């Protein structure tokens, strides 16, 4: 009796080991294609610059940074890639791979291959990158995620506006008068050495003249080391209150959301909202409709570069 129990436990452990060794199956069978060389050096949907010599891939729903293992079902060859782009948008394609991954799968001549997709260990992807650099000394060095090192740029840093925790007014700079009804307590902060514009923080209980929604990423700003005045509320149109936050809860301490009145005001500024990862595209569209019913209007636009889906959120106008 004891021997039968030991055999049963050993069989269960063996099956579990084989399951974890194989990895989680994402797609048992689908078609893979690879990027044309003309895309090399262009930005991807994640913001990275596409490198055809790195082991990367594009998928419609998998989160950026996901590491998967592809197996060519016709010849048994495997490769580990990292998702850093969106696509492909052909009806019968499941994934797009870089040229380096296509060479590893031996699919350059055919252009398309039947593959299976399994979830992989990120450490295995890093090991594959190191081995490839040893065999291909002409390829630029890359980090553990397969991204070539980039030189620091002078672009403006990302700024976050928090109406609940305004920064203290620096010594020697003009601050607004607290306690005056209807007047926002603002601080004139000069543009930094990166050329980023100042951000106005509203005191609790007052109506801010401008509250950035989400994360605003300036496209280009001229360097300026002098203080710039905060725009007055008369130059902006009044917007309806936003009743729900991004997580579904009520918004507290925020009276209104700034709404652009013309396209020139949003030039160089892009709001990116990532709602989550979905296996099916219709599930993502269903969430967009749900958010629209909660007074959060999401405009999905297909970008020209690698067909990246971007969402722009605005409060509805009254």
Curated annotation (Swiss-Prot):
For whether the record's keyword set contains Lyase, the answer is yes
Mention one GO molecular function: lytic endotransglycosylase activity
Q: Where is the signal peptide?
A: 1-21
Could you list this entry's UniProt keywords, alphabetically sorted: Cell wall biogenesis/degradation, Lyase, Signal
What Pfam families does the record tag this protein with?
DPBB_1
| Keyword Signal (UniProt) | yes
Q: Which domain of life is it from?
A: Bacteria
Q: Which segments show compositional bias classed as Polar residues? A: 125-137
What does the record give as EC number?
Answer: 4.2.2.-
Q: Which biological process, per GO, is one annotated for this protein? A: cell wall organization
Cited HAMAP family: RlpA (MF_02071)
**What name goes with this protein?**
Probable endolytic peptidoglycan transglycosylase RlpA
Q: Which organism is it from?
A: Treponema pallidum (strain Nichols)
């Amino acid at each position: 009796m004891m021997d039968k129990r030991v055999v049963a436990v050993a069989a269960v452990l063996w099956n579990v080991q084989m399951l974890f060794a194989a990895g989680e199956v994402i797609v048992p069978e689908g078609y893979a294609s690879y990027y044309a060389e003309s895309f090399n050096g262009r930005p991807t949907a994640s913001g990275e610059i596409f490198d055809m010599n790195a082991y990367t891939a594009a998928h419609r729903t998998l989160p950026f940074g996901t590491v998967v293992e592809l197996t060519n079902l016709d010849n048994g060859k495997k490769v580990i890639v990292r998702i850093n782009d969106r696509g492909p948008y052909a009806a019968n394609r499941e994934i797009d791979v870089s040229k380096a991954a296509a060479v590893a799968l031996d699919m350059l001549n055919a252009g398309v291959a039947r593959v299976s997709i399994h979830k992989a260990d990120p450490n295995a992807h890093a090991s594959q990158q190191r081995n490839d650099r040893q065999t291909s000394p002409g390829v630029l060095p890359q980090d553990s995620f397969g991204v070539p090192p980039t030189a620091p740029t002078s672009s403006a840093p990302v700024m976050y506006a928090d109406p609940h925790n305004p920064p203290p007014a620096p010594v020697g700079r003009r601050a607004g008068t607290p306690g005056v009804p209807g007047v926002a307590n603002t601080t004139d902060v000069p543009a930094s050495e990166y050329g980023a514009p100042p951000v106005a923080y509203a005191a609790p209980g007052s109506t801010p003249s401008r509250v950035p929604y989400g994360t605003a990423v300036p496209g280009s700003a001229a360097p300026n080391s002098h203080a710039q005045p905060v725009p007055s509320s008369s130059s902006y149109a009044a917007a309806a209150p936003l009743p729900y936050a991004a997580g579904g809860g009520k918004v507290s301490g925020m009276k209104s959301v700034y709404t652009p009145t013309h396209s020139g005001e949003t030039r160089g500024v892009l709001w990116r909202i990532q709602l989550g990862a979905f296996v099916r595209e219709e599930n993502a569209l269903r969430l967009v409709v749900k958010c629209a019913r909660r007074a959060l209007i999401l405009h999905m636009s297909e970008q020209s570069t690698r067909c990246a889906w971007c969402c722009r959120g605005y409060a509805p106008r009254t």
